[in-house]
């Protein structure tokens, strides 16, 4: 039994697992399971390796990704989640911003076989540095474990997000302040987004896959 995930082309729930249609059949990115079904190959999207997968499995809805979407990914690391987004936006682009040279080396290897992924060795807190290399985005996705993660997310949305686009941030409370209640931190970060002209579309916690994380989906206020 296969169920399509609303709003996300090529994403399904199969046998209680989240899967994407493999853009590069036969090729794994992080040792994920491959499933052949109905003449297509699917990659299991592991929610313990991908916060976006965890958010979707926990019920996050309200944004659209289609084959022509352009995505700006802040904190792409070695490309685990970005590769699944690449499966979805087959004719679009995934601009992968990563600051760590070590992670970038691994990310480049993923990008070599996925022509719609663009690796950028840049600091996500300085969007003007890569402004000429990135097109306007349908989705700005942020998974950066820094105290100012919401601030840099907002700056990137101000630079790159289309008027009708979406922003999705994985707020890590312990990276902001280990001494305070995660619930209070999540409320404050959501407030920063509202104060900057964005409305909250949806938000979900990431338990049991991640502790003290909250996925917050936003869009520009009308």
Swiss-Prot record:
This is Fibrillarin-like rRNA/tRNA 2'-O-methyltransferase. GO terms for molecular function: histone H2AQ104 methyltransferase activity; RNA binding; rRNA methyltransferase activity. S-adenosyl-L-methionine binds at residues 80-81, 98-99, 123-124, 143-146. Its EC number is 2.1.1.-. Involved in pre-rRNA and tRNA processing. Utilizes the methyl donor S-adenosyl-L-methionine to catalyze the site-specific 2'-hydroxyl methylation of ribose moieties in rRNA and tRNA. Site specificity is provided by a guide RNA that base pairs with the substrate. Methylation occurs at a characteristic distance from the sequence involved in base pairing with the guide RNA. Keywords: Methyltransferase, RNA-binding, rRNA processing, Transferase, tRNA processing. Coiled coil: none annotated. InterPro entries: Fibrillarin, Fibrillarin_CS, SAM-dependent_MTases_sf. GO terms for biological process: box C/D sno(s)RNA 3'-end processing; tRNA processing. Interacts with nop5. Component of box C/D small ribonucleoprotein (sRNP) particles that contain rpl7ae, FlpA and nop5, plus a guide RNA. It comes from Methanothermobacter phage psiM100. Belongs to the methyltransferase superfamily. Fibrillarin family. SUPFAM superfamilies: S-adenosyl-L-methionine-dependent methyltransferases.
């Amino acid at each position: 039994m296969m169920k399509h995930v609303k709003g996300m082309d090529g994403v399904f729930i199969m046998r209680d697992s989240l899967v994407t249609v493999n853009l590069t059949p036969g090729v794994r990115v992080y040792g994920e399971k491959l499933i052949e079904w109905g003449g297509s190959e699917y990659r299991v999207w592991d929610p313990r390796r991908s916060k976006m997968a965890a958010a979707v499995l926990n019920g996050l809805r309200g944004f659209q990704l289609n084959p022509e979407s352009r995505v700006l990914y802040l904190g792409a690391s070695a490309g685990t989640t970005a590769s699944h987004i690449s499966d979805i936006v087959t004719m679009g682009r995934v601009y992968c911003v990563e600051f760590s040279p070590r992670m970038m080396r691994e990310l480049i290897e993923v990008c070599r076989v996925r022509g719609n992924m663009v690796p950028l060795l840049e600091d996500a807190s300085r969007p003007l540095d890569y402004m000429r290399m990135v097109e306007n985005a349908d989705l700005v996705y942020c998974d950066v474990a820094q105290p100012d993660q919401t601030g840099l997310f907002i700056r990137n949305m101000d630079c790159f997000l289309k008027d009708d686009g979406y922003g999705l941030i994985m707020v890590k409370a312990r990276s902001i302040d280990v001494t305070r209640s995660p619930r209070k931190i999540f409320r404050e970060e959501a407030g920063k987004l509202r104060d900057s002209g964005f409305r909250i579309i949806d938000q979900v916690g990431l338990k049991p896959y991640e502790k003290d994380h909250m996925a917050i989906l936003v869009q520009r206020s009308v």
